[in-house]
Amino acid sequence: MIDPNLLRNNLAEVAEKLKVKRNFMLDTEKLTALEDQRKNLQVTTENLQAERNARSKAIGAAKARGEDIAPLLAEMDDMGNQLTEAKAQLDAVLAEINQIALSIPNLPADEVPLGKDDTENKEILRWGTPRTFDFEVKDHVTLGEEANGLDFAAGAKLTGARFAVMKGQIAKMHRALAQFMLDLHTEQHGYLETYVPYLVNHATLYGTGQLPKFGEDLFHTLALQGEQPYALIPTAEVPVTNLVRDVIIDEAELPIKMTAHTPCFRSEAGSYGRDTRGLIRMHQFDKVEMVQIVDPDKSMEALEELTGHAEKVLQLLNLPYRKVLLCTGDMGFGSCKTYDLEVWVPAQNTYREISSCSNMWDFQARRMQARCKAKGDKKTHLVHTLNGSGLAVGRTLVAVLENYQNADGSITVPEVLRPYMGGLDVIGK
């Protein structure tokens, strides 16, 4: 949620930025009308409350003098009814303003390039050189099936499309990748490992911005009797970031760096017909997520650090990748600046997204009321939150299988993974 003071004091400027940079049309007339109503009702309730307090004192004085206070009590009751009605109207207006505010995307940072879609993203760097093969390249589906380690038919039988079963050495490599990532982030990058629920409530989803706008992208549970409804997490960013919801953090404890390995569940609404073959776009996939809670003055610096942590995974696996700064038209709803890392996928002869690292500024913190303050200081201020994939495990498996394949269909195990696989150096044939 963007700063409400910006909407009150710089509405026209904010609306223009949202139109140009986000292709988002803010209904300024409606918002202005609601703001006028809010101000009027605020004054009305404050005046009624002040008058009611004054009348209450007058009743006390009249009673002490032995006067008949029945007429005064009747006036108080009437004033109380007026106050209750005015407060209800004010609450309704505030709720409507809040619903509009929840639908507004974050404002991009000034350095984010203007653009309509991913064709206008800005490439920052490339690392590594794509391998030249002297044999016909197989895709990860063929490699995995030939190794008897990927079974999409079983996934479809058990559940449906966009699900897979992994077995044997492929399943072991998938697990090894996640363990390697967690160890790297906790032992070298300073993150605290967390284990979090895979089901979250709606307040949690509002906190990080999935609701109310992206409800169709989630898998929702039916509420049991006496229970609130839940949704499966689309990313560990949701529960991990919400650990600081409604918390006032001592500034001395910042930055807070947390990581988690979880399955992620996405409906992939709007992705019909895209990446229907293989592990690239699944309803269920594993990801190691990194989250940072930082001082507002240090969030851009933290974004560079966090992105570097994701890059380190790719570098240690010796997987060629490129780093891309997303343009305004390709950014996520809550982000003010995002880098994507795209790994080389030989069978597709292109780079594919494997990590997205974002500075959310105070957008999520305002929704969550996640604040910090210096020791001895009474005033609090919102923290900044960042998140990034470090990495998507299934897509990393895709990249390893295809980049490390051999002519006989076997796959060489990257050196950094061998300790996690009992010293195994080749899988497959």
Swiss-Prot record:
L-serine binds at residues 235-237, 289, 389. PROSITE patterns: AA_TRNA_LIGASE_II. ATP binds at residues 266-268, 353-356. Its EC number is 6.1.1.11. InterPro entries: aa-tRNA-synt_IIb (IPR002314), aa-tRNA-synth_II (IPR006195), aa-tRNA-synth_II/BPL/LPL (IPR045864), Ser-tRNA-ligase_type_1 (IPR002317), Ser-tRNA-synth_1_N (IPR015866), SerRS_1_N_sf (IPR042103), SerRS_core (IPR033729), tRNA-bd_arm (IPR010978). GO terms for cellular component: cytoplasm. It comes from the Bacteria. Catalyzes the attachment of serine to tRNA(Ser). Is also able to aminoacylate tRNA(Sec) with serine, to form the misacylated tRNA L-seryl-tRNA(Sec), which will be further converted into selenocysteinyl-tRNA(Sec). Consists of two distinct domains, a catalytic core and a N-terminal extension that is involved in tRNA binding. This is Serine--tRNA ligase. It comes from Haemophilus influenzae (strain PittGG). The gene is serS.
